[in-house]
């Protein structure tokens, strides 16, 4: 699992009937991840994602708030923002505990327009390094969202 470093990813796509597609729409997605080792045993991870779609996309291409504890495709909009933080405490080289909190917004309630209906989720989890030679971690997370409590089995990092 990452303990330091940053990742920035930006992508834009165009789907067009003139190019053989079934729909006409454009997407833009931005992701920023940052990991900070604050102590020998503690790592802070930060995540910000933005996605937008223009024109007339099918329902499955409309961006949605994607976080542990939030059902997929539940909160969709032409613009979506997600911000999440995860703290990880390493007990030893093979076991760790995580805690996470995140908020999401769709174009109907982006922070600049309305913060009364922020979509938030939080939870805790445990990690075990299953393969030392490949640095593969397996985990179990418990997340609470606005609707349900959910368990997740993770292989690798959740982001």
Language-model-detected regions and their locations in the chain:
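C-terminal outer-membrane beta-barrel translocator/porin domains of Gram-negative envelope proteins
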Residues: 1-93, 97-109
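Short, surface-exposed acidic/glycine-rich loop or hinge patches that mediate macromolecular interfaces
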Residues: 53, 143-147
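Outer-membrane beta-barrel "beta-signal"
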Residues: 123-133, 147-159
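Outer-membrane beta-barrel architecture
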Residues: 31-33, 84-86, 125-127, 139-141, ...
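Transmembrane beta-barrel architecture of outer-membrane proteins
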Residues: 25-29, 80-82, 119-123, 137, ...
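Conserved active-site loop/cleft motifs that coordinate metal ions or position small ligands
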Residues: 97-100, 136-142
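Hydrophobic alpha-helical segments
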Residues: 88, 92, 106, 128-136, ...
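Small/polar, glycine/serine/threonine/aspartate-rich low-complexity segments that form flexible
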Residues: 108-118
């Amino acid at each position: 699992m990452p303990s330091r470093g940053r990742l920035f990813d930006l992508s834009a796509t165009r789907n067009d009937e003139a190019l053989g597609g079934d729909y006409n729409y454009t997407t833009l997605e931005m992701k920023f991840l940052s990991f900070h080792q604050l102590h020998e045993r503690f790592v802070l991870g930060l995540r910000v994602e933005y996605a937008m779609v223009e024109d007339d996309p099918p329902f499955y291409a409309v961006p949605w708030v994607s976080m542990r504890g939030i059902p997929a495709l539940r909160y969709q909009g032409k613009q979506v923002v997600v911000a999440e933080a995860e703290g990880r405490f390493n007990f030893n080289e093979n076991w760790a505990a995580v805690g996470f909190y995140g908020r999401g917004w769709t174009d109907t309630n982006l922070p600049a327009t309305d913060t009364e209906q922020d979509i938030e989720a939080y939870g805790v989890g445990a990690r075990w390094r299953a393969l030392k030679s490949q640095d593969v971690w397996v985990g179990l997370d418990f997340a609470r969202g606005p609707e349900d409590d959910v368990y997740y089995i993770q292989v690798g990092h959740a982001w």
